[in-house]
Design a protein with these regions (language model features):
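Phosphodiester-processing cores and adjacent nucleic acid-binding clamps
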Residues: 1-234
Length: 234
């Protein structure tokens, strides 16, 4: 008897509400999820929850479980201490206050309320001349009911590893592990690009060192859900 395939769930979908990034209307996303028999979908639009209500309503109406999340630019307050070209470039970029993007998901009503608080803080906390971001200290105040993924190649741990700052990567992973405990997952992404391959083994080692789970993610910004599913299944 053939072994039944495990259900597949995309956790890193970006809709058209990911401004200047996503191109997938939520109504279309719901129809695709039904057509491809996905039991659930995770939405992680960048720095906002603009589509959370529409996403929840439309997916529930189609019998698909909505997983509400957000990708947040997070300032750990440590990136300017490092002197690699990656960090110096980051310090001079529009994302100067971002040490990388974390993906946070609401696991209950408290988590959703905290996501709302963080979404609001993204726009009210920075100075007028600063890009949209939040500080890790703010997340520490609002971590209840949230599950965290470390963000793939644009996450704070991977960015430190890209700059050969292994101690910085470990310190960030340690901080997140202390904050989220068993709700932290080190995210591995495989889009077939070198910067993912270079750090994958180090990410796996960090997950083991800090007793974090491991999650597979693919950043979906358009309609190619099925194509990416096949890539994972090999």
């Amino acid at each position: 008897m053939a072994e039944q395939a495990q259900p597949f769930v995309h956790l890193r979908v970006h809709s058209a509400y990911s401004l200047l990034e996503g191109a997938l209307p939520i109504g279309k996303l719901a129809k695709l999820a039904v057509g491809y028999n996905f039991p659930a979908i995770g939405l992680t639009d960048t720095n906002n929850l603009f589509g959370a209500l529409e996403f929840s309503e439309k997916l529930w109406s189609e019998g698909v479980q909505p997983i509400v999340g957000c990708s947040l630019d997070v300032d750990f307050g440590d990136q300017r201490d490092a002197q690699s070209p990656m960090v110096r470039t980051l310090a001079n970029s529009p994302r100067a206050h971002s040490a990388g993007r974390l993906a946070l998901y609401a696991m209950n009503a408290d988590g959703y309320a905290n996501l709302m608080r963080l979404s609001k803080a993204m726009y009210f906390d920075p100075a007028a001349d600063e890009p949209t971001h939040t500080k890790i200290a703010r997340i520490e105040e609002c971590s209840g009911g949230l599950i965290a993924l470390t963000g793939g190649p644009d996450g704070p741990i991977s960015l430190a590893l890209h700059g050969d700052h292994t101690a910085l990567a470990a310190a960030r992973c340690d901080r997140l592990a202390n904050l989220f405990g068993d709700r932290l997952y080190v995210e591995l992404q495989r889009h077939g690009i070198d910067k993912e391959r270079r750090v994958e083994s180090a990410l796996i080692d960090l997950a083991g060192k800090f007793s974090a789970g491991i999650a597979a993610g693919l950043r979906i910004i358009d309609h190619q859900l099925r194509h990416q599913k096949r890539q994972i299944e090999g």
